[in-house]
């Protein structure tokens, strides 16, 4: 007989009053195979959103749930859907039909949901089949997958409507519709797709909307798909960010690079870190800069193949990489409209008002980003997103290298750390208005409004009972590193950034093909594929990787030199480098005195001339 243990692992009697009513996964009447999978995944008890939503979904009601990031919303809708499919298979084992359609705004989130389905159905894999339509396969392969009628379909709205219009995706037997991250779906440009899907989905389908916020976009989706839904406004959402220590540093534009170098080289931040920058060029500039000091990092942006992006996140969660530089460029390239914009799908999106239940935050809390001088067409995938939805695990620090343009985006960024009751740190680098534009090579347009955005962020966090504290560095100790930062930053030219950007895209395209083909058959070799290799700017200065002892702060020496720091070579050997280079050039046919191929004349005509 199993004993019920409380949170302190102390056995509780059955008639212990209110504690006996505490919900567990067993009390939710889930299939034993699902319970076994939950135990394998180390799920001890349901979170608030799971305890409230699962019984409602099992009873057949439409649900609109607001819960914070990392609260377990994915399991809250997947478990009851899997339960209903298993019950259907018990009644009719041979029946095949598409029972659930799960819509997500990004490919990364689709892959995450697909992995969750596989995990939860690990002990009933023969009965549960799922398909991810966002994977880049040929149309013929996708039609073959859909023709087999998998039980669960995960897709973006665009892919779903394409397959529906081509009759590849049959929704006639659909019983469940899920819209995950519902507040983002319309702001990613899927409004027309959602309206078309609303016409294609049969009546009576149970609809579940999951969202971190309740915005007017969620209300629009509720009107399209739901029938008198039960609205869950969980109080647990009030605790979002409670375990995050928030700091801000005011610095010049080039000092952002200096502070970042000092933070990671002196190990002022322990653990994994996500660095948010404004656009893709900034991500490669920062990566090349850190490479000068031997600091490895991964770049995550919309230009990389989706397989590579997913693999980077997976390896980061496993602890293979410690630093991710994420290009959160949605606001910079014009995808978030200006105030007063009449765009239907975005007028109340990222810069939009929130209803009264969202603590009274409104458009006045957002700062409009400066207009771009050159309106270039964006090459960014609309189904890419990094600051929302993706399940980054055990992130110790979020570094806002470039401050976002809205207080809401700031909240979503720092939500990558301090998840599941853990603590975290968020550090933002702020450029004062009087220092903006002083250093042209590192200047960034959105930094012009940093102080105004910071004021709104402080105001919003204060309403939540939290504080953004100033982070004070010892300027005298930091100035000692300034000349090294200047040398490294000078080497990272615009040409070097473009070359690195092109090189990594080509390499990741190759890696992406390998991920799809070769590594499916050789999973052990997948570990050899790394995304944090050096991109090599035009001028490499090996001495910058070593920090001289005289630059080390007194308090930091013990921590960094307690162990063997190893041999630091400066590429100097006992060989004569000039003689070695001369021999190498002679072998390449670049001239020389002994037997060079095409290296000039074999004999001096003046020396062979004889006069009598």
From Swiss-Prot:
InterPro entries: DEAD/DEAH_box_helicase_dom, DEAD_box_RNA_helicase, Helicase_ATP-bd, Helicase_C-like, P-loop_NTPase, RNA_helicase_DEAD_Q_motif
Domain Helicase C-terminal: 243-479
Keywords from the UniProt entry: ATP-binding, Helicase, Hydrolase, Nucleotide-binding, Nucleus, Ribosome biogenesis, RNA-binding, rRNA processing
Bias (Basic residues) ranges: 579-600
Residues that hold ATP according to the record: 67-74
SMART domains referenced in this protein's UniProt entry, alphabetically: DEXDc (SM00487), HELICc (SM00490)
UniProt superkingdom: Eukaryota
Localization: Nucleus, Nucleolus
Name used for this protein in its record: ATP-dependent RNA helicase DBP9
Organism name: Coccidioides immitis (strain RS) (Valley fever fungus)
């Amino acid at each position: 007989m199993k004993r019920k243990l409380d949170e302190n692992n102390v056995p509780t009697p059955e008639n212990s009053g209110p504690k006996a009513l505490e919900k567990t996964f067993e009390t939710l009447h889930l299939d034993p195979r699902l319970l076994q999978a939950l135990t394998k995944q180390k799920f001890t008890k349901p979170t608030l959103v799971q305890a409230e939503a699962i019984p409602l979904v099992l009873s057949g009601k439409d649900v609109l749930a607001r819960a914070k990031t990392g609260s377990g919303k994915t399991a809250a809708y997947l478990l009851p859907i899997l339960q209903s499919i298993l019950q259907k298979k018990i009644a009719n084992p041979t029946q095949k039909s598409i029972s659930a359609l799960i819509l997500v705004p990004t490919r990364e989130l689709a892959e995450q949901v697909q992995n969750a389905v596989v995990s939860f159905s690990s002990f009933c894999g023969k009965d549960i089949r799922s398909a991810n339509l966002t994977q880049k396969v040929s149309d013929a392969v996708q039609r073959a997958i859909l023709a087999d009628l998998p039980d669960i379909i995960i897709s973006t709205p665009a892919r779903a409507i394409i397959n529906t219009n081509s009759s590849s995706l049959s929704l006639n037997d659909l019983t469940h519709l899920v819209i995950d991250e519902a507040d983002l779906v319309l702001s990613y440009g899927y409004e027309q797709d959602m309206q078309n899907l609303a016409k294609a989905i049969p009546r009576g389908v149970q609809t579940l909307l999951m969202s971190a916020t309740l915005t007017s976009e969620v209300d629009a989706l509720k009107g399209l798909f739901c029938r008198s839904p039960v609205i869950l406004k969980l109080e647990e959402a009030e605790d979002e960010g409670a375990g995050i220590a928030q700091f801000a540093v005011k610095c010049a534009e080039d000092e952002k690079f200096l502070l970042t170098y000092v933070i990671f080289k002196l190990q002022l931040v322990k653990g994994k870190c996500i660095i948010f920058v404004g656009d893709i060029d900034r991500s490669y500039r920062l990566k090349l800069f850190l490479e000068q000091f031997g600091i490895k990092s991964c770049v995550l942006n919309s230009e990389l193949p989706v397989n590579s992006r997913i693999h980077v996140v997976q390896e980061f969660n496993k602890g293979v990489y410690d630093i991710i530089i994420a290009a959160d460029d949605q606001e910079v390239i014009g995808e978030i409209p200006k105030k007063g914009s009449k765009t239907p799908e975005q007028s109340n999106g990222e810069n939009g008002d929130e209803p009264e239940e969202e603590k009274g935050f409104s458009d006045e809390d957002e700062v409009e980003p400066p207009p771009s001088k050159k309106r270039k067409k964006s090459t960014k995938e609309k189904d890419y997103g990094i600051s929302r939805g993706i399940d980054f695990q055990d992130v110790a620090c979020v570094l806002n290298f470039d401050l976002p343009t809205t207080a809401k985006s700031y909240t979503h960024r720092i939500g990558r750390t301090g998840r599941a009751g853990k603590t975290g740190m968020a550090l933002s680098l702020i450029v004062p208005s009087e220092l903006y534009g002083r250093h042209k090579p590192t200047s960034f347009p959105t930094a012009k409004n940093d102080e105004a955005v910071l004021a709104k962020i402080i105001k919003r966090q204060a309403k939540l009972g939290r504080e953004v504290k100033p982070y004070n560095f010892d300027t005298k100790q930091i100035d000692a590193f300034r000349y090294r930062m200047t040398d490294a930053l000078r080497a990272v030219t615009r040409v070097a950034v473009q070359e690195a950007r092109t090189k990594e895209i080509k390499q990741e395209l190759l890696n992406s093909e390998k991920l799809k083909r070769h590594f499916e058959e050789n999973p052990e070799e997948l570990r050899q594929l790394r995304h944090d290799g050096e991109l090599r700017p035009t001028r490499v200065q090996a001495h910058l990787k070593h920090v001289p002892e005289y630059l080390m702060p007194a308090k930091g020496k013990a921590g960094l030199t307690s162990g063997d720091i190893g041999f630091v070579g400066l590429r100097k050997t006992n060989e004569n480098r000039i003689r070695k280079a001369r021999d190498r050039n002679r072998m390449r046919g670049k001239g020389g005195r002994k037997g060079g191929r095409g290296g000039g004349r074999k004999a001096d005509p003046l020396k062979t001339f004889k006069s009598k």
